[in-house]
Amino acid sequence: METGARIKYHRIKQQLELSDLAADLLLPAELKKIELGEITPSPEVLKALCEKLKIPLNPIENPIGQELIEQFKEMLLHPQERIRIREHYYFILQHPLLNIDEEVELEYSIQLIRFFVITGDLDGAGEKIQELEKFKEFMNQEQYYLFHKYCGNHNYMIKNFDEALNLYLLAEKIAPSSVLPTECGDLYYSIAISAAQLHKNEVADKYSRMALAIYEEEFVPKRIVECHINLGITQQRLKNFKASLDHLKIALKIGKKLNINNLLYISEFNCSIFYYAHRDFNSSIHHMENCLNYIPDEYIADKLAAYCLLVKCCFEKQDYIGLQKWMKTGNNLVIDNNIDLNSPTNQKFSEAYYEFRCLQNLYEENYTAFEKDALKSLIPVLETDKNFHDLAYYYGHLGNVYLKLGKFKKSAIMLSEAQEALKKFNSFH
């Protein structure tokens, strides 16, 4: 970092105005020119400024600090062992070599955005982004690229998918040529999943293939599986059903070879969703039952979502034995974990719990409770998530319930809403 930039960096860091730092030394206008690199300060002025800022006169070479950050960055690129990542974070947290030079300190701050996102501290990530906004001018090209990419990560996690995609595409434009292939792959994959969330299927397909090519070359199995799953989803939306199933089967095959529970979980889950959408309920049940073997006990929302799909399959098959089995299993999960309306802490949890309540009321023919839960709890969540397939499903059930109760006008309205949701689903896919 150049002399003027160093002075400005520490002035901003210490929240000093130009006039505060310049006081008794030189004019604020002269200090501004020094910071901009337009004039070189005399040795006496430079020494006085550095003493006032309490920084060394010259930048410090810090190879050990740089190595600590490189290790941290590598762990964060494809995080698998979050315990090791946390251990490394706590190891370097108070390390004196992270704050003795500006380059390492800035790099560390940027990597903290990624760390907070990975560990689920989204508020911490947001605060770090806000803090770093005023230091963007001091970033080198790679740091500037990573800052925008990690801002994209944060926006993706808070479900601001439009902004996430825009940030990722900007990061692609400003990425330095020295970026490693795996880093490029991670960016392409991030673009793909953001585009998929926005149903920009051609973009999602393009970048999934670009990421897959890199991950196959570099052999990153976890991401190979995830790319095939994303391609399976986008190909289904593009009406290429055979290609969609082929990608999902490849993902499942690789997952079985690697025997990694998380990969098997997402592969089996997406295969089940595919077959459910195509009304092959036996195959859907088979894959979802397999999926349950790989969901950790603490992933309550995921288990509840799996039970919901199994219940819906049994409803469609009119398999009342299976229906009773999965309703009982789901209800035991709710009771054992003391889940109630105040429990959901995020949209995924909310959707799973509200859906299970609706299915339970439907199963027990408690139509008043079903109507209340569907209209007040589940449908608003589905609308927020733009889950048109399930909106059509539950509007349809509401229509049938109103028909049974002789509420013909309400029935017609709900069945019309179901048709509208189905149209939106088909136009999105």
Which stretches of residues belong to each language-model region?
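DNA major-groove recognition helix of helix-turn-helix/homeodomain DNA-binding modules
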Residues: 42-59
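Amphipathic alpha-helical segments of tetratricopeptide repeats
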Residues: 89-97, 129-137, 169-179, 209-220, ...
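A short, Lys/Arg-rich alpha-helix, primarily the initiator
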Residues: 1-13
